[in-house]
Amino acid sequence: MSTHRTLVVVAHPDLATSGINAQLAAAIRDIDGVTVREIASVYPDRRVDAAAEQELLRRHDTIVLQFPWHWYSVPGVLKEWMDQVLTYGFAYGAGGDALHGKRLQLVISTGGPEAAYTPTGHNRFTMAELLRPLEATAHLCGLEMAEPLVLHGAPRATREDVADHAARYRELLSAVPAAAN
């Protein structure tokens, strides 16, 4: 039986200054079968080697996109990566079935509290509503989208909050092979 492989694409524009995303990445780095890829470090000029990234995606069963929520979307570094890697003929369109049946897991940190992501909250929309474009992308690429793991209120999170979230993240990735079957 082959080992389930998970690719974690960490998309923080400056991971060294991130308290939350750096800790989350560190928490899952040593899990067997998990590859952590910090794309802002790999591509500081944002000139993505699409062929190399596509090969990594081919070799993994689950793709995790870990990122801070910026202006109701993914950070620019992740958008650029998606634009260059998830191309016609690879991820969608004629012959574009390389990702079909793979699992997509989003791991997101937000600045606002959970209450801000409600119809009556500051942002007026739920996270599920705001994530629809990523859900549409997953659908187009034939990916099976898992329930997102979201840490709300990241700037105000206590050490215990971050440790608990990191433990949930680690547990989630450790359980991925069972969930994917």
Language-model features: locations:
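Helix-loop-strand module that forms the ligand-binding subsite of alpha/beta enzymes
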Residues: 51-135
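Generic recognition of short, well-ordered alpha-helical segments
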Residues: 19-23, 48, 76-80, 160
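Hydrophobic/aromatic beta-strand patches that form the interior of the parallel beta-sheet core
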Residues: 7-9, 37, 64, 105-107, ...
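Flexible, glycine-rich phosphate/dinucleotide-binding loops
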Residues: 15-16, 43-45, 113, 157
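N-terminal beta1-alpha1 ligand-phosphate binding loop
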Residues: 1-37, 169-171
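Glycine-rich phosphate/pyrophosphate-binding loop and the adjoining helix
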Residues: 5, 25, 29, 131-181
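N-terminal beta-loop-helix "entrance" segment that forms/cooperates
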Residues: 34-57
